[in-house]
Amino acid sequence: MNLNLDSAKDTLCKNILIYGYCKFENKGCAFSHHKPNVGQPPVSASSSSGYSGNSSPAEAKRKFNLNTPSFQPSNVQNITSKFAALSPKVKEIPVFVPSGGSGGAANTPNNGADANELLSQKKFNASTPSFMPAGFGSEYPSSPNTSGAGQPPNPYLTGNGHPASMAQSSGADVYYQQQAASYPLQYHLYAPAPPPRLTIPLPPHETNANSMFIPNDLRETLQKKNEATLQTLPRSNLPEHINIYHSLVPIDKSYDPKSKVWDVPSSLYKVFSSVDGNPYALRKIELNFPIINEAPFKTIKKWRSVKNANVTQLQEAFTSMAFGKSCLVVVYDYFPNSSTLIDHHKRIGTRTEPITEDLLWNYLVQLVNALMAIHAKGLAARSALDLTKIIVTNKNRIRLSNLAISDILNFEKDEEEISKSNRYFQGLQREDIKKLGRILLSLSTLTIPNTLRNNDTGELLRHLKTSSTISFSDEFIQVLTVLNEDTVEFDLDRFSQRYLTTRLFSTINNLEDSTDFMESQITTELENARLFRLLTKLNFIIDRPEAKDWTENSNKYIIKLFRDYIFFQHDEYGKPVVDLSRVLTNLNKLDAGIDEKFLLVSRDEKNCIIVSYKEIRDTIDSVFRNLTRD
């Protein structure tokens, strides 16, 4: 290595920069070992130019000079006054001065100027406050030494939940509890799809892991429903309590300021009951007239008595001032992740369910079933028969929702019409049949081009025969014609006997198949709790070396060897054995306590014992009883 000794003596040794000392300082190291004097005062701009001019030739040749002073503005106030005209608050901006320097001089008021001069020469000041993003919330609390009033919490940040009074504390560390963020569930990591080689049909004696549990799509659907049911909305401006209900979460997917059905502002929420803890759907309707007595709610008792599989159960109805004004509140059963028929089949930009004739027959059977139950109580569905009020709760399973609202909103008009005619409710029930026909016709027209869709019923029925993408049967066209006829008399029982008798068997068959499938899936998951309790006992017992009776000859050591026998086996190639069926088989044998004997070997292969599953089960029960007794 070619080294210029003349320039090396003026170059600071790198060992001094890195380690603070050089072990070759007195053993021939040619570099300088004198640390730079950081206590010298800063050099002004004029003197610095003279200094660079009068420097030695060796210093002039160097590319980096450690003694070069850092740049510092001489007058910050002049810069501030330059931009003072842009904003009236620019002059109020304080000048940044690093604080908290080390050493006793920095803490002495008389030596404040010397401390500032010392800090000004440091390239990196450890006392400079670091930037802390506000979005991290209380996981990174502010410095407890910070004085001044605390900043109010930001309601839009999920983790910023500490009160302002706590931030003013300067003597002790403050613990801020961070709220758990809501992340979408990783369904593909919970139960991954099998590799392609396992998707082919397997022989009867072979199986895969998916056949031991419920299907992935069903598990994902149920998990999404549970997630929607347990969803909360912290720091919202919604009321905390409405009567006995709390934890309001908006679930209405319509952003219209007014309901097109009732022509009044309306919204839908998911709530929890303080009485039974169950979730419910709460419909809020802003009233344009006061309700001063209980007369508008006289039909609520009848509606609560309607028990039908295709009708959303009504819980109660009342008025409330919790939203700041008088509102009508109607509470129904809650079905998570349900969608309306218009969202299920007609919503643009989403994946919609295709229309088929079998699906329409299925809808017709369910709607007729709901209407027969409602009409049998002397009631009418009215506004509930709308594409935006019929909800799809499961695959091809629909229910009428938002019942009894029209009876409350139109109470005065209904009283006047009833006083004029005794057949007023019969007319409302006949109107339900017409709405049923329009709903089926509206869904059927989704199979014809948009240019052919109009409001003329006769033309629509004709286009369904000639221009539809699917071939409707003559029987279905006849049903649409009968439902959309403008006749005064209509017998729903006779209609169902004539047109729906044969279709009922298909619906019943599908429901029974679905019931059998669900029952079979529940059967596969029935014993999961039993094996979980067994594993819990094992983990409570093993790995307690601090216990007085813990030795390699004790009963607990046998249980540990059994744990290793199940989960820490290796094959002949030294690879871990990851076989779920083997684990389930051994746990089932242990739980049953059979007399089958097998060999347990320690990991170092120095200890071995022949034992049966029954002996291990008795040992586990005995040790666990002693553990709970201590």
Curated annotation (Swiss-Prot):
Highest taxon listed in the record's lineage = Eukaryota
The record's Gene3D superfamilies line, in alphabetical order, gives: 1.10.287.3700, 1.20.5.5160, 6.10.250.3160, Transferase(Phosphotransferase) domain 1
Q: Could you tell me one molecular function GO term of this UniProt entry?
A: zinc ion binding
- UniProt lists compositionally biased (Low complexity) regions at 44-56
Query: Could you tell me which residues belong to the region Disordered?
Result: 38-72, 135-171
Entry GO CC:
P-body; PAN complex
Signal sequence annotation: none
Chain segments carrying region Knob domain: 541-630
Q: Where, by residue number, does ATP bind?
A: R283, D333, Y334, F335, P336, N337, S338, S339, T340, T388, K389
Where in or outside the cell it occurs: the entry states: Cytoplasm
Q: Which residues cross the membrane?
A: none
Polar residues bias locations: 140-149
- An example Gene Ontology biological process: postreplication repair
InterPro entries in the cross-refs: Kinase-like_dom_sf, PAN3, Pan3_PK, Znf_CCCH
Entry keyword set: ATP-binding, Coiled coil, Cytoplasm, Metal-binding, mRNA processing, Nucleotide-binding, Zinc, Zinc-finger
Zinc finger, C3H1-type: residue spans?
A: 7-36
Q: What does this protein do?
A: Regulatory subunit of the poly(A)-nuclease (PAN) deadenylation complex, one of two cytoplasmic mRNA deadenylases involved in mRNA turnover. PAN specifically shortens poly(A) tails of RNA and the activity is stimulated by poly(A)-binding protein PAB1. PAN deadenylation is followed by rapid degradation of the shortened mRNA tails by the CCR4-NOT complex. Deadenylated mRNAs are then degraded by two alternative mechanisms, namely exosome-mediated 3'-5' exonucleolytic degradation, or deadenylation-dependent mRNA decaping and subsequent 5'-3' exonucleolytic degradation by XRN1.
Domain remarks: The N-terminal zinc finger binds to poly(A) RNA.
Cite the record's note on assembly.
Homodimer. Forms a heterotrimer with a catalytic subunit PAN2 to form the poly(A)-nuclease (PAN) deadenylation complex. Interacts (via PAM-2 motif) with poly(A)-binding protein PAB1 (via PABC domain), conferring substrate specificity of the enzyme complex.
| Similarity field | Belongs to the protein kinase superfamily. PAN3 family.
Protein name in UniProt: PAN2-PAN3 deadenylation complex subunit PAN3
Q: Which organism is it from?
A: Scheffersomyces stipitis (strain ATCC 58785 / CBS 6054 / NBRC 10063 / NRRL Y-11545)
Gene transcribed to yield this protein: PAN3
